[in-house]
Amino acid sequence: MSTARDRVESITPADGSVLGVAVIDVAGFVADLKSQAIDYGFHVHDERHFVETYSLRQLWEVDLHPEEACAGPIDLHLSLDVDPRALLGFEDEVMKMEDLDEEPPRGFTFPLLFTWTLPPLKYPPDLLVLATDIAGVGGLDLPVEVSAIDSFPSVTDAPERSLSIVARIALDLCDVYMNNDASVAQALDRCKHVSLYLLERADAWLDDEDDDDDII
């Protein structure tokens, strides 16, 4: 494992000038994130990377699902928003460090979002009960927000309810720089528990067996 000194010296020539290479390897972090997700029982099936040409803001997205739900109906969407201002500010602080092996200052963060998706629900749960239960499953390591959207396919149709289940953590660049993945590991562990909680109840929310009774 490389040290802080190795990483900084690798981008700092002998004359003291600084090359245009980032201190934080975001692509490497995303690769490690996918590897960790697999270790916690998720299957990764897609990845996207977007860059705004003007602001240089980046968005990394990873689509995965728990290995118990290969046939659906639950998917988990990870998104990492890379703010160039936070990244450049952190790099400036690292370059000011006299002892390159010490821990850099904290406070520079990227938001890492976890979003669960399910099909529209025929028998949606009570939102207050669901939010309370999921809050207990996610715990303090993964605060989860629950909301819902009702849509009408046509004016004569009954509403279809879709759940919005989102968790957000602040990814401190100090932890990324020091290869400290404890917070990410805790979040992925909680994500697996939330995914299994939803999977156990999804069939009842989606069940359409009663439709046969309405057919004449």
Residue ranges and their predicted role:
Residues 16-23, 27, 120, 177, ...:
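Short, charged/polar micro-motifs that form catalytic or ligand-binding hotspots
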Residues 17-19, 31-35, 132-136, 190:
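Eukaryotic endomembrane contact-site and trafficking scaffolds
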Residues 57-59, 71-75, 105-111, 160-166:
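A general secondary-structure signal for short beta-strands and their flanking turns/coil
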Residues 73-145:
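C-terminal basic regulatory modules in eukaryotic proteins
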Residues 109, 122-216:
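Glycine-rich, aromatic-bearing surface loops/beta-hairpins
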